């Protein structure tokens, strides 16, 4: 049985792409015998034409709506341009396993280029991203996101998404790790890490790990879900937040199931007032925190025109909150 066939079966059974899988592509550091992954692929009779040295060139070879899969070999690729992921049902899968905190030994994409607004900008439909790290460390106010999602039906499993990693970024309004933009309906993430306590202190009240950015009436993304995910950032003021929404940023239900929220401050010098907040006079929505914990935060939400629900163990009447007792 060939390696390509093995990976097709794995994708169908483990990742859940079904049996209608299109072409597969591989990304290595170099197409050279000194590259262990390239050499391995060639010994397994993977054709030269299926092996690429950047995710962008592999993506260019993929065909929209064919359920093509790009397999990224372990290692971080440094990019100098935004990757516009506009094709539908075109998937990116890291072969280094679920991504842990700390990008250096991960599998994915990194940018420190000051002109890269979003490392990946997904506008395609029903795309999946598995076991991938994406980091934007550009020291510029234009470097807003690591991953911007403006396509519906996106699934993200076992990924690590880190933005606002430089001081200039982190002090910019709406800077984020993950941006849910207009068109980003039906988003689903599971076992992912968003943000980091190792890079960039949030320096603006509207910068956050997760930002809902839509400004178009009637286009607010809805029906999203995060399962067993971690959201974390450094803070230097009580007014910072981990989730921020513009006035028309989201609609209907957004569910956080068994997620952790961590606002790190040295020596607990600051306690975040609320995990989530929004621009004044927002559209009505329901944000549910089911069996979640928020560390070094006072509440999930103080007040809102939308509705915030917390379900789970209570501490001082604020479900799942963990604060320093003084």
Which residues does each predicted region cover?
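Right-handed parallel beta-helix/beta-solenoid
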Residues: 1-57, 326
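Surface-exposed or flexible loop/turn and strand-edge residues in extracellular/cell-surface modules
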Residues: 4, 12, 22, 67, ...
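Flexible, charged surface loops at secondary-structure boundaries
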Residues: 18-22, 61-66, 84-87, 121-123, ...
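Surface-exposed intrinsically disordered loops and tails
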Residues: 32-44, 104-111, 274-279, 311
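N-terminal extracellular ligand-recognition/capping segment immediately after the signal peptide
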Residues: 56, 64-116, 133-138
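N-terminal segments that cap or nucleate solenoid repeat domains
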Residues: 58-67, 322-326
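Extracellular beta-strand/beta-solenoid scaffold signature
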Residues: 80, 105-121, 137-148, 165-184, ...
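Right-handed parallel beta-helix
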Residues: 93-96, 125-136, 152-165, 183-200, ...
């Amino acid at each position: 049985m060939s390696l390509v066939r093995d990976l097709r079966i794995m994708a169908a059974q483990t990742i859940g792409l079904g049996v209608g899988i299109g072409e597969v592509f591989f990304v290595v550091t170099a197409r050279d015998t000194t590259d262990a992954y390239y050499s391995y692929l060639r010994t397994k009779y993977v054709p030269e034409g299926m092996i690429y040295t950047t995710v962008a060139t592999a993506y260019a070879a993929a065909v929209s709506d064919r359920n093509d899969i790009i397999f990224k070999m372990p290692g971080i690729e440094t990019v100098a341009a935004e990757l516009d992921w506009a094709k539908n049902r075109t998937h990116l899968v890291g072969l280094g396993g679920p991504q842990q905190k700390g990008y250096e030994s991960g599998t994915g994409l990194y940018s420190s280029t000051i002109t890269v607004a979003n490392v990946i900008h997904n506008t395609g439909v029903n795309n999946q991203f598995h076991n991938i790290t994406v980091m934007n460390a550009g020291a510029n106010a234009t470097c807003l996101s690591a991953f911007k999602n403006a396509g519906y039906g996106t699934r993200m499993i076992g990924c690590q998404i880190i933005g606002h990693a430089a001081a200039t970024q982190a002090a910019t309004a709406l800077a984020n790790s993950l941006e849910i933009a207009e068109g980003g309906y039906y988003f689903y993430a599971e076992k992912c890490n968003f943000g980091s306590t190792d890079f960039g202190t949030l320096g603006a009240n509207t910068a956050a790990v997760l930002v809902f950015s839509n400004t178009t009436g009637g286009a607010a993304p809805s029906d999203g879900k995060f399962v067993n995910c971690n959201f974390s950032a450094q803070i230097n003021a009580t007014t910072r937040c981990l989730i921020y929404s513009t006035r028309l940023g989201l609609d209907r239900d957004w569910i956080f199931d068994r997620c952790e929220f961590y606002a790190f401050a040295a020596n607990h010098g600051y306690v975040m007032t609320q995990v989530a907040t929004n621009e004044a006079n927002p559209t009505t929505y329901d944000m549910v925190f089911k069996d979640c914990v928020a560390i070094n935060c006072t509440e999930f939400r103080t007040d809102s025109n939308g509705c915030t629900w917390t379900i789970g163990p209570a501490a001082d009447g604020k479900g799942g909150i963990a604060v320093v007792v003084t």
